[in-house]
């Protein structure tokens, strides 16, 4: 794994900028599964796009740097956002409830050399009319906080397991 932040789980982890790894002279990638920051790409922040145009371009550049890597298999995960118009539509849109989690979070996958991710445990729509992470009106339950972006960006274990099992 690679992130600017510490890892939450044991295992190999590079704490730093992914560009350092992409441009390493000895880099020879078999597969890349990337989760670039969505803060400036997701449609949930659309009302701020004019204000953060420069930051948005930096995020687009990082996304495209990953997409254009010399690697036979690439998956890029991000929520519904501007990359569908800035680059191309995603190959697939998945939901946590397709992988055993009673939540809703539309997640786009842009794929190169990889098959579509097959759902592993599709849950029925709740009788109450909304998923565990939603209010009755369908909004996300998390209140504003310094941790909100990190908590909303967590990868669901069922999706991570499906990626490892099907692509690994």
Predicted regions located by residue number:
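Conserved active-site and SAM-binding loop architecture
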Residues: 1-168
């Amino acid at each position: 794994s690679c992130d600017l932040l510490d890892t939450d789980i044991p295992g190999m982890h590079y704490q730093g900028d992914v560009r350092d790894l992409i441009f390493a002279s000895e880099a020879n990638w078999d597969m890349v599964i990337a989760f670039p920051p969505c803060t400036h790409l997701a449609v949930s922040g659309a009302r701020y796009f004019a204000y953060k145009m420069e930051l948005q371009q930096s995020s687009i550049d990082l996304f495209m740097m990953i997409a254009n890597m010399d690697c036979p298999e690439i998956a890029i995960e991000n929520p519904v956002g501007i990359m569908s118009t800035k680059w191309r539509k995603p190959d697939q849109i998945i939901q946590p409830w397709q992988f055993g989690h009673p939540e809703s979070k539309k997640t786009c996958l842009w794929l190169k050399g990889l098959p579509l991710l097959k759902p592993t445990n599709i849950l029925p729509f709740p009788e109450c009319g909304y998923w565990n992470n939603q209010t009755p009106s369908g909004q996300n339950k998390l209140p504003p906080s310094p941790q909100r972006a990190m908590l909303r960006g967590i990868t669901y274990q069922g999706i991570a397991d499906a990626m490892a099992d099907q692509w690994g």
